[in-house]
Amino acid sequence: PTISKIIGKDFTEYGVSVVNVRGTGLRRFAKILQRADAGETLDIRVSCMTDRDVMPNCAPAICIDQRYSDIALWPEKEKRNWKAECDFISQNERDLYLERILERANGQRVKTFVANHWTFEYDLAYAGLADELIEAIVAVRYESKNREQRIKDIQKKCEEFPDNESKSAYLYSFFSLKGTSKAEVAQHLSFILETKYASDPKALCERLPPYIRDAINYVTEQEDA
């Protein structure tokens, strides 16, 4: 809700509610808002946001186990609960994987928006909000007297990585390896974004992952007369 408010699409004004379905699953939630008879479609636009759940190839070593810097040491696909980009042998296979995600909830006025790269937090960092994410992570993990130095330390560590993928994966490792609460980080991130971008919504919009912008736009679009 904070992001939508900052970029001038306040969910409250549009009558939009946010629901975290968590373990319920998109498909079950979407079915509540879909009708068996297409002629009785509910006149309610619904955006379902979900992770892509495909790691960049660098992420297993950064976010799971350092040994996985050698792909030969990865467990067989059938014996692990994660996927990486190199698991797909063709673009067609990637496209089919994405289609299956979309099919879980798409239909009638319900539309699914899948993370452009991996997860919500990773995509925020990848798209341009890495510094804000660092600040939020530090606010959750460290006492106020240590935060300024911790931010510098993490930023310096990020500079050691060769590309945006590995830098963003490193920031995600604070959740996957170090147990940082995503919910608490989200709360702090909301405050940080509002403080930094309330007077410059265009700058925030430019730094948002495209799928988040699209999901917000879909539920706040004005209907044609």
Regions found by a protein language model. Give the residues of each.
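Acidic, divalent-metal-binding catalytic cores of TOPRIM
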Residues: 1-225
